[in-house]
Amino acid sequence: MEHVPNEHGRFGDFGGKFVPETLMLPLEEIETELDKALADESFRQEYIRILQHYSGRPTPLTFAPNLTRQLGGAKIYLKREDLNHTGAHKINNAIGQALLAKRMGKKKLIAETGAGQHGVAAATVAAHFGMECIVFMGEEDMKRQELNVFRMKLLGAEVVPVLSGNRTLKDATNEAIRYWVAHCDDHFYMIGSVVGPHPYPKMVREFQRVIGDEAKEQFLAGEGTLPDVIVACVGGGSNAIGMFYPFLQDDVRLVGVEAAGKGIDTPHHAATIAKGTKGVIHGAMTYLLQDEYGQIIEPYSISAGLDYPGVGPEHAYLASIGRVRYESVTDEEAVAAFQLLAQTEGIIPAIESAHAVAKAVELARQMTPDETVLICLSGRGDKDVQMMMHHLGVKEGEDVASAR
């Protein structure tokens, strides 16, 4: 595999910088400072120190014995990003970008958020580093994730409701970029996934690869070999790239799981790689959901963190060369997996992560007991419990099983 991205920020045909002239200079400044920071051992050590002492890394690699036994197939392991401070993988990237922002002398952070986890992570690091934070969030997502909205405000962030479009992640990103264009002198735009113009996909990957680096070391120590299959959910795709990147050169099957919503043959899904075509969104060439006139088709998923109409350009590249297989899981399959993991292992996953669990369960059933499946459990499900109650029709005091 060629080294990507190249000097133009391209992953094969994908990536690049499709932005207005006003953003070229800020992006070049970030790229220059990022490269310097990544080459600076003291920056790397400070990043690792904060991950360990503030976020609680390394996160454990957990064997799932009950789920494994129930399925009767491959051994299932979970990389526990749900045990990070703030409850998801998003904090890895937020710490890295906040450190870079401070190094560049920026005083204020801008973030967009879908499920709210990146917004919470941005607000958290802003509080930790003594910076201001403004978070753009679609009004629809704010309704779905009221708890995270309150968390962000509690942490001192200003949360701006976005009323345009579908009022979800795409629209929040549009507004965040508009705001950044007008305030790039003293603000740092902290993108939450491996999307956007170069150098963001590379930067977020570099701050998320700690997931895969740790998992590789832990798996080798525990099993004496690498996993046969690794599964991760894909919206923008930062947890998946973070997990996959250190394994790209190894003989390991990599499976990304998109949101099939109500079915990929309906208009209600967010399966960008399965159903999308090449186009530019938020400054990068990638696959996206668009009509014949190039207008964005609004995505849908039960998961606020997966209903993005594009995908990280590195994922588009990995799909195009066949290195990673991308599949999709419906709302109902994800809901079933959400309940299954809770009831077999006592671990409530984020609804995003439940998409990966659903696909891993399907794959593990077809495998032998001497094979292994590693799931990136990207976040915990506390934020989704209220939504799940409504979805399952559970009334207070009622048994979950009887509500179905």
From Swiss-Prot:
Pfam families: PALP. Its cofactor is pyridoxal 5'-phosphate. Coiled coil: none annotated. InterPro entries: Trp_synth_b_CS (IPR006653), Trp_synth_beta (IPR006654), Trp_synth_beta/beta-like (IPR023026), TrpB-like_PALP (IPR001926), TrpB-like_PALP_sf (IPR036052). The modification N6-(pyridoxal phosphate)lysine is found at residue 90. Pathway: Amino-acid biosynthesis; L-tryptophan biosynthesis; L-tryptophan from chorismate: step 5/5. Gene3D superfamilies: 3.40.50.1100. The keyword rRNA-binding does not apply. Its EC number is 4.2.1.20. One of its GO terms (molecular function) is tryptophan synthase activity. One of its GO terms (cellular component) is cytoplasm. This is Tryptophan synthase beta chain. It comes from Geobacillus thermodenitrificans (strain NG80-2).
